[in-house]
From Swiss-Prot:
This is Deoxyribose-phosphate aldolase. InterPro entries: Aldolase_TIM, DeoC, DeoC/FbaB/LacD_aldolase, DeoC_typeII. Keywords: Cytoplasm, Lyase, Schiff base. Its EC number is 4.1.2.4. The active site is at residues 102, 165, 199. It comes from the Bacteria. Catalyzes a reversible aldol reaction between acetaldehyde and D-glyceraldehyde 3-phosphate to generate 2-deoxy-D-ribose 5-phosphate. It catalyses: 2-deoxy-D-ribose 5-phosphate = D-glyceraldehyde 3-phosphate + acetaldehyde. CDD domains: DeoC (cd00959). Pathway: Carbohydrate degradation; 2-deoxy-D-ribose 1-phosphate degradation; D-glyceraldehyde 3-phosphate and acetaldehyde from 2-deoxy-alpha-D-ribose 1-phosphate: step 2/2. GO terms for cellular component: cytoplasm.
Length: 258
C-alpha cells in the first residue's frame, strides 16, 4: 500500500463525517449515516445538529454500526459569550443522546481581552457533559494571531476540554496547517497529549491534505498519538476523495451518496 493510501485509510477512520447545513433533513442525516459505513472501515463519528440525533442513532443501529459516535454542536456557529445558553444547549445535546459535543468558544470575547468568560463557558459545558467528549472550537481563522490561538487553546485545556478544534467551517478561513501546528504545539508544550486531542475542521478536502496534517501530528506528538481518541478530521467532501484514493468501489453503497 502506498504512503498516500495508508494515510487515506488512517484519515477515514479518524473522520467526523459532517453535515451542518441549514437545509439538513432527517433523510440527509440518514444518508450521512450510511456513508459513514464503508467497505474499508467506518468513520469515527458523524457530526450533526442536535435535533437529528435520535434518527441518526436509529440509522446507525439498524445498519449494524452502533460504534460510530454521534457528535453535535452547541453555541454554534457564532461563539457567543452567554454561558447560560451554551450550557443549556450542551445539556440538551446530552439529553438527546450525543456521544460528543463540539462547542464554540467565545472567541470574540477573547479578542476583546476577556479570558474569563471562555474559561467559565468551557468549564461549565464540560461539567454538563460529564464523561461525554467535549471538543472546543476556537475559530482560528477569526483569532488569526498566534498569541490568541495559543491563548485560546490553553484556556480550553485548563478548563477541561477533551479536544481543541480549529473551526466551525462557517467563516472565510477555517483549518490551515499553520494554525494546526500552533494548536498541536500547545498540546505538546502543556504536556497534555495523553488527555487532550486535536480536530482540524473545514478545508481538509483531499487525501494529500489529510496526509500532511497527520505527518505534522506524528512529528510533534509521536507516530502513535493520532488515534481516534486524540485526533479527528471534521469534514464532508473529504470522504469521497479518500475512497477514490483507496480505489474503493463498494457494490452495496448507494451510488447517489458519492
Amino acid at each position: 500500500m502506498s504512503d498516500l493510501k495508508a494515510a487515506a485509510l488512517r484519515a477515514l477512520k479518524l473522520m467526523d463525517l459532517t453535515t451542518l447545513n441549514d437545509d439538513d433533513t432527517t433523510e440527509k442525516v440518514v444518508a450521512l449515516c450510511h456513508d459513514a459505513k464503508t467497505a474499508v472501515g467506518n468513520t469515527a463519528a458523524i457530526c450533526i445538529y442536535p435535533r437529528f440525533i435520535p434518527a441518526a442513532k436509529k440509522a446507525l443501529r439498524e445498519q449494524g454500526t452502533p460504534e460510530v459516535r454521534i457528535a453535535t454542536v452547541t453555541n454554534f456557529p457564532h461563539g457567543n459569550d452567554d454561558i447560560e445558553i451554551a450550557v443549556a444547549e450542551t445539556k440538551a445535546a446530552v439529553a438527546y443522546g450525543a456521544d460528543e459535543v463540539d462547542v464554540v468558544f467565545p472567541y470574540r470575547a477573547l479578542i476583546a481581552d476577556n479570558e474569563e468568560v471562555g474559561f467559565e463557558l468551557v468549564k461549565q459545558c464540560k461539567a454538563a457533559c460529564g464523561d461525554i467528549t467535549l471538543k472546543v472550537i476556537i475559530e482560528t481563522g477569526e483569532l488569526k494571531e498566534e498569541a490568541l490561538i495559543k491563548k485560546a487553546s490553553q484556556i480550553c485545556i485548563e478548563a477541561g476540554a477533551d479536544f481543541i478544534k480549529t473551526s466551525t467551517g462557517k467563516v472565510p478561513v477555517n483549518a490551515t496547517p499553520e494554525y494546526a501546528r500552533m494548536m498541536l504545539e500547545v498540546i505538546r508544550d502543556m504536556g497534555v497529549a495523553k488527555t487532550v486531542g486535536f480536530k482540524p475542521a473545514g478545508g481538509v478536502r483531499t487525501a494529500e491534505d489529510a496526509q500532511a496534517y497527520l505527518a505534522m501530528a506524528d512529528e510533534l506528538l509521536g507516530a502513535e498519538w493520532a488515534d481516534n481518541m486524540h485526533y479527528r478530521f471534521g469534514a464532508s467532501s473529504l470522504l469521497t476523495n479518500l475512497l477514490n484514493t483507496l480505489e474503493v468501489t463498494d457494490e452495496t453503497a448507494d451510488p447517489a451518496a458519492y
